[in-house]
Curated annotation (Swiss-Prot):
GO terms for biological process: pyridoxine biosynthetic process. It comes from Wolinella succinogenes (strain ATCC 29543 / DSM 1740 / CCUG 13145 / JCM 31913 / LMG 7466 / NCTC 11488 / FDC 602W) (Vibrio succinogenes). Its EC number is 2.6.99.2. This is Pyridoxine 5'-phosphate synthase. The gene is pdxJ. Catalyzes the complicated ring closure reaction between the two acyclic compounds 1-deoxy-D-xylulose-5-phosphate (DXP) and 3-amino-2-oxopropyl phosphate (1-amino-acetone-3-phosphate or AAP) to form pyridoxine 5'-phosphate (PNP) and inorganic phosphate. It is an enzyme of class 2 (transferase). The active site is at H42 (proton acceptor), E69 (proton acceptor), H213 (proton donor). The record marks E150 as: Transition state stabilizer. PANTHER family: PYRIDOXINE 5'-PHOSPHATE SYNTHASE. InterPro entries: Aldolase_TIM, PyrdxlP_synth_PdxJ, Pyridoxine-5'_phos_synth. GO terms for cellular component: cytosol. 3-amino-2-oxopropyl phosphate binds at N6, R17, G214, G235, H236. Keywords: Cytoplasm, Pyridoxine biosynthesis, Transferase.
Amino acid sequence: MLLGVNIDHIATLREARKINEPDPLEAVFLAKRAGAFQITIHLREDRRHIHDYDVERIVESSFLPVNVECSTDKQIVDLLCELRPHRITLVPEKREEVTTEGGLDLLGRFEILKSRIAQFRENDIAVSLFVDPDITSIELSKELGADMVELHTGTFANLHLMLRSNLPKTPHAIPALEMDRRSLSLAYRESLLTLQKAAQKANTLGIEVAAGHGLNYQNVSEIVKIPEIIELNIGHSLIARSIFTGFEAAVREMVELLGRGD
């Protein structure tokens, strides 16, 4: 299974002081040396971490494929069509959110998504859609002409945290998931089954499958067992681990974990 390294939070650290370091571009070369498959960055409308010049420099300099996550915002879409990264992943976006909270509303935004996908295709850019892991979303992704879907693993990841970590004992416990362990265990197994079914459906329709959101060193072992998923995009847990082990070592460790699913 391939690893896409999301380096947004290197830029988050830079923006905390609003200076010029750490430089996300430096991480691109370290990720390659550690065995990563691609670089993933999110150019948000509010530019809270990655900026336009970051995208330009990374696309121009990276020896690895670059996957840029973005909304359907016209200014951003036009810019990315000029820069031409390897792939675009269209994601939903709310300015008030801490991180992406769910998959795209494919039905409600069908026409704008179709238009943006066509524009990227005209510029020879592959398109992935960040979707909730349900059959309807997969079928709509096929109808829209997506090359790939990235399955939102947030529910699975949150259940894993509440079931198998100390999160329930911290101020960041998830209120909606405060339930007994038996209920958590059942919901956890159901979330895995949902991901498996969505991946299988996409595979039968000829759509490549990636996954991401909330994945870490503790929970990826379950995801690598799903053979239809060929790529994971992981950021926060890698950057968090790198504080203690170094960035290159953190990436290499994750690459090794994903390799166990081959």
